[in-house]
Swiss-Prot record:
It is found in: Cytoplasm. Belongs to the MurCDEF family. This is UDP-N-acetylmuramate--L-alanine ligase. It is an enzyme of class 6 (ligase). Gene3D superfamilies: Mur ligase, C-terminal domain (3.90.190.20), Mur-like, catalytic domain (3.40.1190.10), NAD(P)-binding Rossmann-like Domain (3.40.50.720). The keyword Cell wall biogenesis/degradation applies. It comes from the Bacteria. ATP binds at residues 119-125. It comes from Streptococcus mutans serotype c (strain ATCC 700610 / UA159). It catalyses: UDP-N-acetyl-alpha-D-muramate + L-alanine + ATP = UDP-N-acetyl-alpha-D-muramoyl-L-alanine + ADP + phosphate + H(+). Pathway: Cell wall biogenesis; peptidoglycan biosynthesis.
Length: 452
């Protein structure tokens, strides 16, 4: 196990099986920055995390048995098993020991004061915000679910995203943790919202010094932990209350109080009600951890967001927003943010459902969420490698349930999107929705050859 107290063995390579995964790529970057030799393997298909890996000079290899050797520490992505990956199969058959991502991380974080961010939605944005503020105040290492990682050997703090899928967060015992919400997702694993709650309740019991949870979530109100639980939100019965909220096209301004103690006014250059909550969670955590509020206030103002969370670009005077939203709750939050920043523009949603199981389980909720847009376009369902399409649901089934104008498009023909004027285009999904986005960008660029 790698710790900062040990002499670095610079000849030992750390090999990541599935290095393009968002958590894996972030961890690879972190260890690379700490001075370790890092490499990894994955499929050839482009994934947005590989830009950072390539920029750092980290080798990305095709999957091959020859990648596995005696002189390395192996970290395997959670999705890779003996029956679907030749490297995992080779390692198991030949006695090579490896750790799963979450197992490695659970041991690694023990050398720091660790701050986790869990929740069904908003983990990545909140982790990014917490890491941004803390790294500008003191030496901080972090892992963010957008594939971003930073490693400093002398860090006091370690900020990380804590994922509930398949209960992967159970090896984690952080000093502090934010939990943004509890909601039913991952129907391929969880049996229902009560099963999700049970997982989060088990995780909460492992937090050591302080738990910060959204007070208006009825499931979060039922959590139990030996650590103090602090509720944040908009209601007077919360421990940390955000109030006097002013939403504008420049972001959100608000005040926070803790009991009778006024913590002051804050600004975050982010949009949507959910981002006020995320910022309040960060403020609460850092206040209890003893961080000076003037410093928190100063660095909240300079947060520029995380990858694939309301990421904006301008192509020929057309605004395109890229977002990872793949659950109805996330879609509503993203469209709310778009309306805050662009109140006078038509909001056009382009959404790709992610996994057949989720689409079946939440079909009506997806339709209701997408009705928050002015117009809707749907891409074909992106199936997970963990499931088989039995033909039980088609994207047209979702289109039929949407009240607003809704059409199905293909990646080869996105020209129907040109029918809108004075519009903002919001591309949402966790699959390959960016292929549709790139097709639209190319179409716009070819119209005037004036890309900026």
């Amino acid at each position: 196990m790698l710790t900062r107290g040990e002499e670095k063995n610079m000849s030992k390579t750390i090999h990541f099986i599935g290095i393009k995964g968002s958590g894996m790529s972030a961890l690879a970057l972190l260890l690379h920055q700490m001075g370790y030799k890092v490499q990894g393997s994955d499929v050839d298909k482009y994934y947005f995390t590989q830009h950072g890996l390539e920029k750092a000079g980290i080798p990305i290899l095709p999957f091959a048995e020859s990648n596995i050797t005696n002189d390395m520490e192996i970290i395997a992505g959670n999705a890779f098993r003996k029956d679907n990956n030749i490297e995992v199969a080779y390692a198991l058959e030949n006695g090579y020991h490896f750790k799963r991502y979450h197992e490695f991380l659970g041991e690694f974080m023990n050398q720091f004061t660790s701050l986790g961010v869990a929740g069904a939605h908003g983990k990545t944005s909140t982790t990014g915000l917490l890491a941004h503020v803390l790294k500008n105040i003191t030496d901080t290492s972090y892992l963010i679910g957008d594939g971003t990682g930073r490693g400093l050997a002398n860090s006091q703090y370690f900020v990380f995203e804590s994922d509930e899928y398949e209960r992967h967060f159970m090896p984690y015992h952080p000093e502090y943790s934010i939990i943004t919400n509890i909601d039913f997702d991952h129907p391929d694993y969880f049996t229902g919202v009560d099963d999700v709650f049970a997982a989060f309740n088990d995780y909460a019991k492992q937090v050591k010094k302080g738990l910060f949870v959204y007070g208006e979530d009825p499931y979060l109100r039922k959590l139990t932990s030996s650590a103090p639980i602090y509720y944040y939100g908009f209601k007077d019965n919360d421990d940390f209350v955000a109030y006097d909220i002013m939403r504008s096209t420049n972001g959100s301004d608000f005040k926070v109080r803790h009991g009778q103690n006024e913590l002051g006014s804050f600004h975050v250059p982010a949009f949507g009600r959910h981002n006020v909550l995320n910022a309040t969670a960060v403020i609460a955590n850092l206040y209890i951890a003893g961080v000076e509020m003037d410093l928190v206030r100063q660095h909240l103002k300079t947060f520029s967001g995380v990858k694939r969370r309301f990421s904006e670009k301008l192509i020929n005077d057309v605004t395109i927003i890229d977002d990872f939203a793949h659950h109805p709750t996330e879609i509503i939050a993203t469209l709310d943010a778009a309306r805050q920043k662009y109140p006078s523009k038509e909001i056009v949603a382009i959404f790709q459902p992610h996994t057949f199981t989720r689409t079946i389980a939440l079909l009506d909720e997806f339709a209701q969420a997408l009705n928050e847009a002015d117009s809707v376009y749907l891409a074909q369902i992106y199936g997970s490698a963990r499931e088989v399409d039995h033909g039980d649901v088609k994207v047209e089934d979702l289109a039929d349930k949407i009240v607003k104008p809704a059409k199905v498009i293909t990646v080869d023909n996105v020209s129907p999107l040109l029918d809108h004027h004075n519009a903002v285009y919001v591309f949402m999904g966790a699959g390959d929705i960016q292929l549709y986005e790139r097709s639209f960008e190319e179409l716009l660029s070819n119209l005037t050859k004036n890309t900026r």
